[in-house]
């Protein structure tokens, strides 16, 4: 019940933050911390990780989301990177000890603020750890799309053109984008559980 109760507070904190209700998000964050700091969290095991280790990942994730919605973007990125570090340090589990890769949020919010190269690095790293992860596929596609526009001098048609300052670079981006889009489309249309349209790498992104 400890992990379940904490997870409910975690989910509510993220939901309130992304609905713009920062005070409610902070209240849920405090309630989450009550469970996270419970001494029993160190003694309880969920598969291969302690509950304390799992909840330690969630704490900077919550604070990072809240900070971002408050406009404190650099503080948010620092917190989310800390959450990524903690998640990467969890013991191997099958299924994963934490089912939501923090990189979804980190990459998506970096991209939202125009940090295209940093976001691309985040998504590529996640795809190495979680091959064909549709959320990171979408994030990487969005990064490449933005790079394509920059390469074309601000064009928005998504196709290589004679005005491109670097035709070979444009061609490489277009080719990879098409491959990723095919992979994502096949994945989302071939399974009975793929019934949700992924529009962003994370639901926290606008």
Stretches with model-predicted labels:
Residues 150-206:
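Terminal, low-structured helical/coil segments at or just beyond the last alpha-helical repeat
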Residues 11, 55-58, 62, 105, ...:
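"A position-specific structural signal for the A-helix of alpha-solenoid helical repeats
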Residues 30-41, 81-91, 125-129, 182-189:
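Amphipathic alpha-helical segments of tetratricopeptide repeats
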Residues 1-2:
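Short, small-residue-biased leader/transition segments that mark boundaries at the very start
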Residues 16, 67, 110, 144-147, ...:
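Residue at a conserved register position within TPR or TPR-like alpha-solenoid repeats
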